[in-house]
């Protein structure tokens, strides 16, 4: 109550931020007349002036009003477009390292130019991050004339660029690129062997476009550079043939319940588990097919790999559906479909053998499982930037997560013109067929009025179902989904024409505005060297059509299902009503929709369905509230999963930083002989401790064992027993010193034989190679540790604490192994000449380049929801007894009055 009153009096936090920024907008506007009077040359000279002022000690905040006024004036001259005041506010929010929530059509791309120009002045580089290559290239080309007018360089960072071109792109003042590519470049740089092979500069400032998509939807997607591991294609194919023989066990409370099924499915957590019957049946099948020994069990240590394959195949068959979760391309490749955007994600693969299992299910060529060589999550990559900001049309629902995980405030930027879109309440039907019939009727009416319609579906399968229904009804339409990715921009350009009907999967086409009346620019682009007269004629024709569409009611949005996240529903709605245009939206739902089926209580579902006739719809505030509650529940669960994933990845992240810093140090150093000398002493002392325990009697020493060990591991044939026999006063300390001195002398002699310069190169090369090999093995060990850690909950231990403790022990082992492996190699290998070192370097570089080609963003599988098994609900084996049924104990009382009270 008091909070509400205070908000009314002093305004919300957002209002207060906007009030502060509006004062600076006035200051920027005051510069406008003076800047309008400048010649082009004088305006261009401002960049040099600002850079000099930074050198003299001025900071970016002091330069902001003049810098923004410069960009606005340059934009008027280059594009004929003047930044609105709200865009200036958006630019200031981005510069402040915050998230600007700007509605669709409010000009986010132009807003970003303000913050990008200002932050590029110190010469450290600005990265503008987009969701795909098309948008990166489009935005870079669109804004290039403006930045170049102001004396700034612009680059594009997209996949498969030659290394010199990529290095040059990173030197640009402003670099546009995709989130995947920036992350992969970071990993590739940390696999390089020479400083000149690296492409990135220090990460100074990033503006993330569609920030919710990249930092939230993609947050569970680790970027992984991997190399092929062992080939087990045959096993996937053989196990795949067994899975169709298994039967699903129905839910206990369903009418057709049978307790003898082989597996259970949990739709909420996307998990599938073998029942006891199922385990026995699978074991029988494996024995029969010669994949397991008679009397053996699936859960014995020797069969861990077999169990992994069975689980992957079961999930592939039961949980992953063709044309919903993935598509199969004409050349037989299984490509993941992003559940959030409906786009395909070529190059991405599910981990844990799931992708191979899906390939076996679809009968296409199975790619080998991969071994991780380097990996990072987007969460940890973007936290490497000194300053991070973002833009999106919908961030407010996830403001808490941005604040919690990235420390980013969200500021809602007001629209330039008031929003007049009519958002109608949801309507709910009994079945999907009734819902589709109502949607088609609505589309017909809109088309007759000449109103364009955009229909949002949640999967490719649903978009094709609806498309077929529209064909039957004789309604012309376009389909925008992952299968027709190439035509995307063309279809979006047409989507605003009178009576145009476009079906879009989720947010395919995001980042491209739907202009009412269609895009006049697209028409102009089709002409060869158009004259000004032709352009004016096209514009005049477009204006007429634009007004006609506005008269008909603007763009009408139809949602065919509620998404798990309110944000994605809001994104669909946000396609309409841009820049104060007319528009409307409505969601059509049915009791068969996934969200309603899983999250609406049985009682409410029965209540709704009992009072409805066929084809009848229901509009109810209670139902809308119930749906929103379900969405909040899912969002909360997804937030917990992402937060948990981050907590686990933070452990690996700290270790990654240490390893990458050590690599940097090794690469930039010309001479690491001091480090090698220290390591040699540590390693030899540790070996001597095993055979000559510190402060022990001579009788406890194992001199023969020590002599053998030094000879075998370090190529040091030392007559230690003879030394001791010859000198009664050779005590432990003196003996240790003598052994180390001998080791140093032998090493120096080896160095003189090939020259110190060759030896320095060889040391560096061996150290880097050993570090990379151990890091790769460490990542695999961390993966295995991670997969089973939740079972510690059974022992009343905190899985997260256990993971931290054990991963720290693994990391300590890595550092110890690094020392001993390097010293062993340097002691035993005989280097003849510099060419050998160079050949070894070249071989390693070739391997790294091959691995870098295996860069892929892997989907964290549903297992990443790391459930603490100790808190799992108990599962009942016998039939559920109704409250009013006779108690099974035979007392004759009702169950609720007998044993039901105890339960």
From Swiss-Prot:
Residues bound to ATP are 87, 105-109, 513
Compartment(s) where it occurs, according to its Swiss-Prot or TrEMBL record? Cell inner membrane; Cytoplasm
What are the GO cellular component annotations? cell envelope Sec protein transport complex; cytoplasm; plasma membrane
> Which reaction(s) does its UniProt entry say it catalyses?
ATP + H2O + cellular proteinSide 1 = ADP + phosphate + cellular proteinSide 2
Annotated Gene3D superfamilies: Helical scaffold and wing domains of SecA, P-loop containing nucleotide triphosphate hydrolases, SecA, preprotein cross-linking domain
Where on the tree of life does the source sit, at the highest rank?
A: Bacteria
Note on cofactor: May bind 1 zinc ion per subunit.
State the top-level EC class. translocase
Question: What is the membrane topology noted in the UniProt record heading this document?
Answer: Peripheral membrane protein
Q: Where is the signal peptide?
A: none
Instruction: Name any one Pfam family assigned in the record.
Output: P-loop_SecA
Q: Subunit composition?
A: Monomer and homodimer. Part of the essential Sec protein translocation apparatus which comprises SecA, SecYEG and auxiliary proteins SecDF-YajC and YidC.
What is this protein identified as? Protein translocase subunit SecA
